[in-house]
Amino acid sequence: MKDKLITKNYIEILAANFLLFFGFWLLMPVLPFYLAEVFDANKTTIGAVLSCYTIAALCIRPFSGYLLDTFARKPLYLLAYFTFTAIFGGYLIAGTLTLFILFRIIHGVSFGMVTVSGNTIVIDIMPSSRRGEGLGYYGLANNIAMSIGPMTGLFLHDAGADYTLIFCCSLGSCLIGFLCASLVKTTYKPPVKREPISLDRFILLKGIPAGFSLLLLSIPYGMTTNYVAMYAKQIGIQASTGFFFTFMALGMRSEEHTSELQS
């Protein structure tokens, strides 16, 4: 008999993960319009502001694993999730571009932490015999959020919805997700004794070529996902560009079949 995968705990963290990414993806394609219309930002400024989020998320990730092994995991997860959620409200009160950039950096740090801690916790609560299947469903939640989140955000924007409403939709999604996350029960894991943190623990020489390849792949991906809606508007495409993200998410599911072919 297989170990049970679909438990109350698993459903709760699956819902928390989906709602977090839904809130994230709902807002992402709308932000360039918001910065241009509200702060009168030019293209260079928009790119710099949006990149602050990604850079901040990347900077915290190498330290996230160390923190999760040193301190209790669920409190760190909830703290990061709450911070990520609260920043959506912060965007609403950001009266200057400088303050918006500050919130954007904090948002990126919390996103980097909450995603790593969420991945760690879901592994902890799953039976080891069904870990691959469980992680597959967990990743599928991200793809579903990616397929409908941007479409929802762009639909609201194209329909003339106020930016406050769009931000509140992301905030509401993550608030419900935070409630789901707080219901997840985790078992106590004693802290792992580690050597003092140092730079060399984050650098794997064998991984540099693969990391560089991923970097080159991520640059056009980031440019496309951030600017495709604005570009479509500039060249006169009338159809909703939200479907672009839907089809892209469907295409990303091909990785499952690729893995099967490789094995």
Give the location of each predicted region.
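Cytoplasmic helix-loop-helix junction between adjacent transmembrane helices
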Residues: 105-141
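Residue-level signature of mid-helix packing/kink "hotspots" within the transmembrane helices
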Residues: 54-62, 146-147, 249-253
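Paired small-residue
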Residues: 98-106
